[in-house]
Amino acid sequence: MAADISISGSSEMVLDMGNSATADDSSLASETDININFSNTSDSGISTSMNYGIDEGGANDDMIVTISGDFGSLSYTNAGDDHALNGGDIDPAGTAEERAPAAADMHANTYTGGLPGIGDNHVTFTLPSLVDGLTLAGSLSNGTGTTATTGEAASYRVTFDAGVARIVYGEVRAATQTDTHVGVSVPLGGATIQIAQNSNDETGVDNSATLIGVQYAVSDALTLGMEMDKGENGTAAQDYDMTSIGA
């Protein structure tokens, strides 16, 4: 049986108003992506798919292979940020492209709320639905380093979709640090409101970030968005604050 092939793309222009504790970092940014997806379903009901993404710089992005059936789904990828939690967290992305303040304008301990990857090659397993609306997924990577992105690491995600709201809880666990995420997404007609609280137990700091995003679908081809992020680590002079507006 021949595979079905679909090609999709998107582009966004964003005004970022990021403020570090010491500088005004407002700037324009853009995000353009192309996705090519190959899919097939066997006579036995096993489905396979491969997604190949290309970002605006021409680099490989979102390369994921998935096998699914009554047993759930198993996927592998070479993208470290496509693990179980990062692939299904409440990411208040009112805009697709946000520009954080320049590294030189932020303290080394400034926390922006980002979740780490778990290695460029990892596997993810999603259990079949046991209760309507409930999804459980986990990822595992194995490397020789000591951080989540270079060494042994795992992530998991618990999602409950009640229709009127979607709630997500999950963690990224590595040898020396655990990152925690809790988020909720609420659809309101053509609008969607997303709120997330991210934190970790990095030694010597108290990292916590609140991320809020609002999207409104004007039409099938146009979506407006706004995002507001605030990160803290226990020291006011190292706080992070970013607002972005995009279409």
Feature map (PLM): residue ranges:
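Outer-membrane beta-barrel proteins
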Residues: 1-247
